[in-house]
Amino acid sequence: MSLLVQLDQKIAANGGLIVSCQPVPDSPLDKPEIVAAMALAAEQAGAVAIRIEGVANLQATRAVVSVPIIGIVKRDLEDSPVRITAYIEDVDALAQAGADIIAIDGTDRPRPVPVETLLARIHHHGLLAMTDCSTPEDGLACQKLGAEIIGTTLSGYTTPETPEEPDLALVKTLSDAGCRVIAEGRYNTPAQAADAMRHGAWAVTVGSAITRLEHICQWYNTAMKKAVL
C-alpha cells in the first residue's frame, strides 16, 4: 500500500491534522529531544503526520514516531528569498534522516536550484514531494511538475504585508483543480482548520497554535492588555 493511500485512510479516520513542530529559533524548546517529544505527543493526540525542520530534529523525531514526517531545511540565502529546502544536499540529508515527504519552496522566485530538479531528487529517493506555494499559479505549476502534495504554506509570506486570516480561497482553488492540498499558514484555531477541510483541504498543518509557546503567550498577553487598557 502506497504512503498516499495510507495517508488517505488515516485522514478519513482521524480528520487530517498535521502538526508542525518547529520551535522559535533559540527558544528553550529549540532542542532535538524536545522537538521529538512534542512530535510524539502530537502523534499520540491523533496527528496523522508531523512537519519537522532540520536534519538533527528529524533524526530525533524519526526515532520516536511512526507517523509520516514531512521534512524541510530552512536557510537564509544572500542571493535568493527562497528559504525552504533550497539545495540538493538538503534533500539528500532529509532523505537519509528518515523523512517520508520532503517539502520545498514551490514559488516562482529566483532560486539556486530549479523546482523540477529538486522534485526529481526527492523522487530519486522514493519519497513524496510537497511544494510550499503562495498562489494558484505556483501550485498548478508544481502539480504539473509532479509534486504529489501542494501546500498553501507561503500564501501571504511573499508579499509586503501578511494577512491575519488563512487563505481559504487558495485552498479551494487548488482543490477544485485536482490538487492534494495541505492547508498551512495562520490556522490558529480549530474552527479555521475545519473551514479549510470544508474548502477542500486534504489535510491541515498547524504549527504556532500548538507548538510555539512564545506565540501563544503573546496572543493571550495582547488580548488581555487590550481588555484592561
UniProtKB/Swiss-Prot annotation:
**Molecular function (Gene Ontology), one example:** N-acylglucosamine-6-phosphate 2-epimerase activity
Q: Which branch of life, at top level?
A: Bacteria
What pathway is this protein said to act in by its record?
A: Amino-sugar metabolism; N-acetylneuraminate degradation; D-fructose 6-phosphate from N-acetylneuraminate: step 3/5
Which catalysed reactions does the entry list for this protein?
Answer: an N-acyl-D-glucosamine 6-phosphate = an N-acyl-D-mannosamine 6-phosphate
- Identify the InterPro entries for this entry: Aldolase_TIM, NanE, RibuloseP-bd_barrel
One GO cellular-component annotation of the UniProt record comes to: cytosol
Q: What is its EC number?
A: 5.1.3.9
| Alphabetically ordered keywords of this record | Carbohydrate metabolism, Isomerase
Single GO biological process annotation from the record: N-acetylmannosamine catabolic process
Which top class of enzyme applies to this chain? isomerase
PANTHER family the record matches:
N-ACETYLMANNOSAMINE-6-PHOSPHATE 2-EPIMERASE-RELATED
Protein family (similarity comment): Belongs to the NanE family.
Q: What does this protein do?
A: Converts N-acetylmannosamine-6-phosphate (ManNAc-6-P) to N-acetylglucosamine-6-phosphate (GlcNAc-6-P).
What HAMAP family is this protein classified in? ManNAc6P_epimer (MF_01235)
Q: What is this protein identified as?
A: Putative N-acetylmannosamine-6-phosphate 2-epimerase
- Whichever gene encodes this chain, its name is nanE
